[in-house]
């Protein structure tokens, strides 16, 4: 199985049950690349002596022969076996995984990464935009021993069980939350669809016990509302496989409400599925190229739009320094065609494509395989998309809910409407 996807530039501190606090998840889908399996591991001597056969021609051999690699690994393992103080605690499987992970990371590419089985499962779950759980977002403040529910999805098992944003979770089934990290607590809450989980929460001075039946939850990646003067506001948190349908439904709803202009908010959107972002742009752009992708051999693929659904109303796209990858494909294309104005600050600057390959045993390799270019031929890698209207975010202590960047984007749209 191969997928081409986009990596995340930042970690999350608030996690739906399908999120990992320390992962850099990639997103997207492009076809046609090939990945070579670069390592095979065998375990000898009761699991204590590991021998690795490095294959793959010039990509793996370099100036060091296969025999040299094997001899050095044999020596390292012999030294561990002979002298290592904590020999009884050695996990042979973990050593194997460390070889694979280190091999990928030694490329020095921040977007190339090896995923073990557990990480790969979470990765694929995240990419699909669906997970099995109760439909709640959890957060844990730095140094805090408690876990707070910050969001409950509408009509989710959590909602039906009566959980509310602000509830403090202190026990999951028989597990005490105090002293545990957020990722561990999330893993307790998750589980197979149809199974029950008992949660104990504090709400004000009251302690409550609720039971929720886990179900398949679709991550809500699109939020929208109508602002004053019939200006629609549509926020996209990431480009998952479920995002296109949510985006299309949001556009239709805003149109039905009499929308005369639109703000699309991509701030803090780390990227996502390439098919998703190109499909979304086909609802906005005129006929032409959406994005071009060039591999190491110079082969180029153009993804195009037929222009049948071109958006002609005033449009502003909000971005910031954490708008990355697929978000930059979106904003770059809108900017190149003049479909709307880009408002905010220069984006992250990730203009490369990763391919995700199943290594056959449930583990995956994510490998950078191509660079992408906006419709005008711009590479934004390491550069980002510069806004048409630059606005730095300013926090207002007197009004924490104030958003000067959004206010400016609305002003831009309003001016175009006049």
Positions of predicted regions on the chain:
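Intrinsically disordered, low-complexity repeat and linker tracts
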Residues: 1, 9, 50-57, 259, ...
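Conserved P-loop NTPase
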Residues: 354-358, 365-396
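Cleft-lining beta-strand/loop regions that shape enzyme active-site pockets
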Residues: 15-18, 150, 159-161, 165, ...
